[in-house]
């Protein structure tokens, strides 16, 4: 029950009606008995500055930030965590001692779920990544900081891939996969990651990589979690590759935000279960 002592957190985005975050976080708050409540706020871009002022005025403990505000919100905050600065986007804001601090939990949420669910040793990985957008930046920078051997980027826009390769290349060897070189790049990779929306509902017959490029020595990871098993993952499983779906990243990025706001460990099992139940209802 919400009382006068309830600590409020929430989500700023546009639109937000599809979000699983309120259900996931409120279930976690109930499970832990913490006096927090989570709401989704549909904030149009022209109202973002007022909404950020509202965090201060209303005493919110923090917020999640989603599309289209992850970059636009950065100059409105008092401090940006170094990893979020490198990624160039914020997905979590914490209000601490009157200051608003921006973090990005997407990359660490991804890495935490990948390691927990597959047992993968990151230091041994040669990574091929499909995509060079915001999700790709978060994942690439975090994997680089965790010490993977090499990152290869496949992307429709070479220009965007070049920018990401240049920045990540300051930490770990990174190269662009040129047109026609995708199959060869994946052939001697150990981890393949789809960071694009190719294969997401309703376009479930699409896949970012032809099945014949996959091999059993791969761990194939897809950031999409709706559907829970994309065509890419089905085809990878069929040839004996290890597969990893996007639900773990979604749950763990939320769990890390929960921990930043509350200082308590998040009940990730409960959070995962409620999201799974919700997805099964809607698919």
From Swiss-Prot:
Self-association and partners: Homodimer.
Organism of this sequence: Brevibacillus brevis (strain 47 / JCM 6285 / NBRC 100599)
Purpose: Involved in the biosynthesis of the chorismate, which leads to the biosynthesis of aromatic amino acids. Catalyzes the reversible NADPH linked reduction of 3-dehydroshikimate (DHSA) to yield shikimate (SA).
Enzyme class: oxidoreductase
Gene transcribed to yield this protein: aroE
Keyword Phosphoprotein applies: no
Keyword field contains Oxidoreductase: yes
Protein name (record): Shikimate dehydrogenase (NADP(+))
Pathway: Metabolic intermediate biosynthesis; chorismate biosynthesis; chorismate from D-erythrose 4-phosphate and phosphoenolpyruvate: step 4/7
């Amino acid at each position: 029950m919400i009382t006068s002592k309830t600590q409020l957190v929430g989500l700023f985005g546009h639109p937000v009606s599809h979000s699983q975050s309120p259900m996931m976080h409120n279930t976690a708050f109930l499970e832990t008995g913490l006096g927090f409540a989570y709401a989704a706020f549909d904030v149009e871009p022209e109202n973002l500055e007022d909404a950020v002022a509202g965090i201060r005025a209303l005493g919110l403990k923090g917020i999640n930030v989603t599309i289209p505000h992850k970059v636009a919100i950065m100059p409105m905050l008092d401090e940006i965590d170094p990893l979020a600065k490198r990624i160039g986007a914020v997905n979590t804001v914490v209000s601490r001692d009157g200051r608003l601090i921006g973090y990005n939990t997407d990359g660490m949420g991804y890495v935490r779920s990948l390691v927990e669910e597959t047992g993968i040793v990151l230091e041994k990985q040669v990574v091929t990544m499909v995509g060079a957008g915001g999700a790709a930046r978060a994942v690439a920078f975090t994997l680089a900081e965790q010490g993977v051997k090499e990152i290869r980027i496949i992307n429709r826009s070479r220009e965007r891939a070049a920018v990401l390769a240049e920045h990540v290349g300051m930490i770990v060897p990174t190269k662009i996969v040129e047109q026609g070189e995708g199959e060869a790049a994946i052939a001697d990779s150990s981890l393949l990651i789809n960071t694009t929306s190719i294969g997401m509902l309703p376009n479930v017959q699409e896949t970012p990589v032809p099945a014949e490029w996959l091999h059993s020595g791969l761990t194939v990871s897809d950031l999409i979690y709706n559907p829970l098993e994309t065509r890419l993952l089905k085809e990878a499983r069929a040839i004996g590759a290890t597969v990893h779906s996007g639900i773990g990243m979604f749950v763990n990025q939320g769990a890390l935000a929960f921990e930043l706001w509350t200082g308590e460990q998040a009940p990730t099992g409960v959070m995962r279960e409620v999201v799974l139940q919700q997805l099964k209802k809607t698919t």
